[in-house]
Each structure stands twice: as structure tokens, then as C-alpha cells.
Amino acid sequence: MNIKKNWISSAHRGFVEGALKENSLAAFYNAHINGADMIETDARFSSDGILIANHNPTAEGLNDKGEEVTCVVAETPAETLCSLILSEDDVWGVQRIPTLEQVLNLAYHTGLQVNIDLKNGYEAAEPVAKMVLKCGMIGRVVYALNGSGMKGIETIMAIDPDARFIDKGTGFAQSVQTFAERGKRCFCYTDDVSEENVNAIRDYGCLLALISLNENNYESAIRQKPDMCEFLHTSDFRAIEENYLKKVKLY
């Protein structure tokens, strides 16, 4: 019996082991070599308008003197943010906060797809899509709309006609009911794997993305036949999926 997975395996902020830090180029590359189909990252504007890959409104790291520094991303220029050291001793050397462009360039050369969380919402839709175009990643990006709905979809598709989209649960599903291609392009993400919730998303005609997965909740999630499985950055998704597929072969 030939068993294979039919879902997208996504590593939330990469895959962290040892001294690696989330949302670093090393964490994203580690996700790639462990077999991820996709990585998830975040896009925020620095004070000078550069898209930075950082989850929180603040960025934390070490300066070149080894001192701990916390910066408000929106109030700090990119040069300062990208000089902050995330880790000094991981297997790929010193890691600093990356720009979105650096993340997309890595994805281009590794074949990864990317889920980009637009932390600035609609304001970031056009700039992020233009960066995706610049980096040769058209058709390989899922845009997390952060509530920008059909307005965001239309703006992005004018630049990236093969774009896919993701947002939270049934609220997003309801907001895209006029979008004829939602069944191919729109993922609803949720950590609620109940039949009621999953069926509601399916009934709206959207794709299902289950998030925050680890070894404890994966099997209950995969029973719902998701289109995307997004794993926590500390989850060994490769081992989890291999163990599951071995069990399937025994049925």
C-alpha cells in the first residue's frame, strides 16, 4: 500500500532546535532540510518602511556589545533592527533579525512556500505582494490577511494573480462568500478540531488549516483531513508525520 501525505506541512516561524531562534533564517532553513513544504513568517514595517520578519510589535536581541536590547519595530530603522543578534552559537553561526526580502530569497532557492502574516493589515497588502513579485515567489505565497478581507484579496491579486489567502476561522469564511475561487485559494485557520467547527468551515467552501500542532494533538487534527497542518516552531513535524504515516500503513 502506497501511503503519502496530501496536506501542506507548514513550520510556524521555522523549526527551532538547540540554540536556533524562531523567525531566523537558520530556523527557516532547518524547516526546509527537515521536509517542510511551507514556512510561516511575519511582516512588519520598520520606521523607514522596510518589511521586517518579526512576530511581535517589539524586537529583542543582543547588540554588538552583547547587551540585551528591545526595540519597537515601527519606531526603529531597519538597519538597527537587522543588526540585533538573535543567536550567536547555532550551527549556522550568528543569526540576526531578517528582512522579509531575505526570507523570500531563502524560500526561492529552497523551493519553500511561504505564509506571510501581514501584521500591518491592509496597509501591507500591496508592498508585500510587490516584494513577493521582486523575489520571484509569485504563486508560492499564502497571505495572512489580518482582517483585510476582499479588499486585501483584490489588491494582492492585481500583483500576484496566483495568490492564496488565509485568515481566522468561520469569520473569514463568511467574508469571502462572494469570492468564486475561495475553494482553491482561501484557507481558514483554527485550532478547534471539533466536528462542528470543521464542518462549518467546509460548508462555507473554504480550505481548512489546522494550527498549533504538536505530537499531542496531531492525530486528532489529521482525522479532520486538513489541507494545511501548521506546526509549532518547537514541534518535530517530520518525526510526527512519519510516525503517523507508519500507523496508517498498518490499517
Residue spans of the language-model regions?
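Phosphate-group recognition and catalysis centered on beta-loop-alpha active-site segments
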Residues: 1-251
